[in-house]
Amino acid sequence: MRDMIIVVPIGEVPSDVLSFLSENIESFYMKFGIGVKIIGSLPISAFSHAYDFYRNQYLARHFLPALSIIRRDYKALAVMGVTEVDLYESGLNFIFGIAHPGFGVALISLHRLYPEFYGEPPDRKLLKERALKEAMHELGHVFGLEHCPNPKCVMHFSNSIIDTDIKSWMYCKNCLRKLEERLGRGYVRGRT
């Protein structure tokens, strides 16, 4: 399953969001011969060591080794974890997601992507669009892309949900060219 992106729910994650992510990520990456597969969920209790009681958040980097083991076991190109818990990293109040290109893994949180988090009415379509943008962003990092200055590019850094809402779920022309060069040259495929 080398040319496969594995999607792993961590804790309870809505199945419609997972399906939306899987279908749209695959529709884009299929041109590189990369498919997407959703596997069974990991219990959030497996990451109790990442929980900060005072912040009521999970330290994102502690999820990555488990995702890396899944990548190895499935011989996958990449693994994308999806969770509903709130994530943070040292020096940051929160993060929407994290990626580790060396491990070939990424993680996104839906927690702050729900419109309800901001006091807005529920909007499933908006939630799914935001989740797709964050997933494509983190996968871009997995495949070697850096942040992009173009605010419409999915690789633009999201400092707030406003930034996420402004950008597209697609890579800009420059980032797409870099991605095509990397995936076309076996940038990721040659890794173990």
UniProtKB/Swiss-Prot annotation:
Which GO MF terms does the UniProt record name? Answer: metallopeptidase activity; zinc ion binding
Give the protein's cofactors. Zn(2+)
Alphabetized, the UniProt keywords read: Hydrolase, Metal-binding, Metalloprotease, Protease, Zinc
- Where's the active site on this chain? E138
Pfam families, sorted: Peptidase_M54
Write down the superkingdom of origin. Answer: Archaea
For the ligand (Zn(2+) 2), the binding residues are C148, C153, C172, C175
* Full protein name: Archaemetzincin
